[in-house]
Amino acid sequence: MLTRFLGPRYRQLARNWVPTASLWGAVGAVGLVWATDWRLILDWVPYINGKFKKDD
């Protein structure tokens, strides 16, 4: 839908920048997880969530 409004030059530029933008997005996500509490993020992962059982 967006390609209908973009010209061929901008479509090619967007196609070239998608891998770079996705890589930087992944680096940013890993950096965000690293900067925050790992356990808070990993509680949402089902396999790892079982390793952090609380002793009640």
From Swiss-Prot:
Stretches assigned to the Mitochondrial intermembrane side: 36-56
Cell compartments where the protein resides: Mitochondrion inner membrane
Keyword Lipid metabolism: no
Topological domains, Mitochondrial matrix: 1-12
The UniProt record lists the keyword Transmembrane helix: yes
Regions that span the bilayer: 13-35
InterPro entries assigned: Single_a-helix_sf, UQCR
Record membrane topology: Single-pass membrane protein
GO biological process: mitochondrial electron transport, ubiquinol to cytochrome c
Cystine bridges: none
UniProt cross-references to SUPFAM superfamilies, sorted A to Z: Subunit XI (6.4 kDa protein) of cytochrome bc1 complex (Ubiquinol-cytochrome c reductase)
Keywords: Electron transport, Membrane, Mitochondrion, Mitochondrion inner membrane, Respiratory chain, Transmembrane, Transmembrane helix, Transport
GO cellular component: mitochondrial inner membrane; respiratory chain complex III
Quaternary state and interactors: Component of the ubiquinol-cytochrome c oxidoreductase (cytochrome b-c1 complex, complex III, CIII), a multisubunit enzyme composed of 11 subunits. The complex is composed of 3 respiratory subunits cytochrome b, cytochrome c1 and Rieske protein UQCRFS1, 2 core protein subunits UQCRC1/QCR1 and UQCRC2/QCR2, and 6 low-molecular weight protein subunits UQCRH/QCR6, UQCRB/QCR7, UQCRQ/QCR8, UQCR10/QCR9, UQCR11/QCR10 and subunit 9, the cleavage product of Rieske protein UQCRFS1.
Similarity section: Belongs to the UQCR11/QCR10 family.
Function statement: Component of the ubiquinol-cytochrome c oxidoreductase, a multisubunit transmembrane complex that is part of the mitochondrial electron transport chain which drives oxidative phosphorylation.
Protein name, per record: Cytochrome b-c1 complex subunit 10
Gene transcribed to yield this protein: UQCR11
